[in-house]
A protein has these predicted regions:
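Domain-level recognition of soluble alpha/beta enzyme cores
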Residues: 153-179
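Phosphate-handling substructures
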Residues: 4, 10, 15-16, 61-123, ...
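Active-site signature of alpha/beta-hydrolase-fold catalytic machinery across serine-
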Residues: 60, 146, 150
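Active-site-proximal alpha-helix that buttresses catalytic centers in soluble enzyme cores
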Residues: 1-69, 100
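Short, active-site-adjacent cap segments at secondary-structure transitions
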Residues: 53-55, 84, 143-145
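Acidic, His/Gly-rich catalytic cores of divalent-metal-dependent hydrolytic chemistry
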Residues: 180-184
């Protein structure tokens, strides 16, 4: 988004994808469509935040899978996957407040606390995982950080936008691996 480009915190403000964001969404869709080659079905539904920057990415993914001969997957909007509300910090530069918000319990005025975000995010994912099948989640950066906290992984890790990741439980915890598409 233009706010990403300017280093501004977006939170719940529904900033549309700019041309870079749309290209990233299209690329993510193409990467995911490759997973459905040879009749494979690595996930059976797409669960997305209602905020347009995530929803448009989810729509590009669904459409790319269908266009490449894959299934027409259901796209489910889950309001619990919305990005955190940053309160008075929305639209402001990412600054010295962000790390204390994650690590020290500081909450900007009018914002959702990191602990509340974590409870909401973990609850939403766990509710979805009670259903049969394998979902693909399309959401937001701070929400993903809160999931990392819930999985006992390092939290304040910045990843590129629209990058596909595998999250896998194991006997010793969780692993997160980027999906690296094979070159064609």
């Amino acid at each position: 988004t233009d706010w990403n480009l300017r280093g501004l915190s977006q939170g719940r403000t529904d900033i549309p994808l700019n041309s870079t964001g749309l290209a990233q969404a299209e690329r993510a869709g193409q990467v995911f469509s490759r997973l459905f080659r040879n009749g494979e079905k690595p996930f059976d539904r797409i669960i997305a935040s209602p905020l347009s920057r995530a929803l448009v990415t989810a729509e590009h993914t669904r459409d790319a899978i269908r266009s490449s001969g894959g299934p027409d997957l259901p796209l489910i909007i889950d309001p619990e996957l919305k990005e955190v509300c940053f309160g008075v910090q929305e639209g402001q530069p990412m600054g010295e407040w962000y790390d204390p918000w994650i690590e020290e319990g500081y909450t900007p005025e009018g914002a959702e606390s990191f602990a509340t975000l974590q409870a909401r995010a973990v609850g939403a994912v766990n509710q979805t995982l009670k259903e049969d099948g394998t979902p693909l989640f399309v959401a937001h950066g701070a929400l993903f950080r809160s999931l990392r906290a819930g999985m006992g992984l390092p939290v304040n890790v910045r990843l590129p936008n629209a990058i596909p990741l595998y999250l896998t439980p194991s006997e010793t915890g969780w692993s997160i691996l980027p999906y690296v598409p094979e070159t064609v």
